Amino acid sequence: YFDVEVRDTNTDEKLKNGAVGEIMVRPKISFGFMQGYLGMPDKSFEAYRNFWFHTGDAGFFNKKNQLIFVDRIKDCIRRRGENISSYEVEQAFLKIPQIAEAAAFAVPAKDHGQEDEVMVALMIIKGSKIEYSEWINKVSADLAKFAIPLYLRVMKNFPKTQTGKIIKHALRTEGITNDTWKNNL
């Protein structure tokens, strides 16, 4: 019923297995997927380009031709020429017993022009000790060097939607605050 491909986000060209791009879907039957977003024609027009529905999700096909989800494209972080999955960074922190929730996002780099830096907001389990350096050392085993956050911030609460999803754009907007820890390791 559908064609699913991973394509370049800028050119819409199909990518080879293993290459990360945008997951796109095309129904084999007209309007077999959906006619558009209800009451949002601009969003519908933006999502459907070149006969493909642009999901906004980054992913790739592995060697077994299985589709692997990487992250929401808007949540991907671009640092030093590398794409970093906020999901992978969050999962590395969630392995640490003291951490209850984690949200990774991009903040503008102060000394690298248009590049971003990785920041992670954390909620810790009540009564846990804040140990920034130790946490960075622990996640370093799971993350590529370029994905290790420069900034960490422990918060009491995250801004969330009614369904409990973390509102990352609110965290990005708030950015680096007085209580943000900078990684000098």
Tell me the role of every PLM-derived stretch.
Residues 173-185:
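Acidic/polar alpha-helix N-cap and adjacent early helical turns
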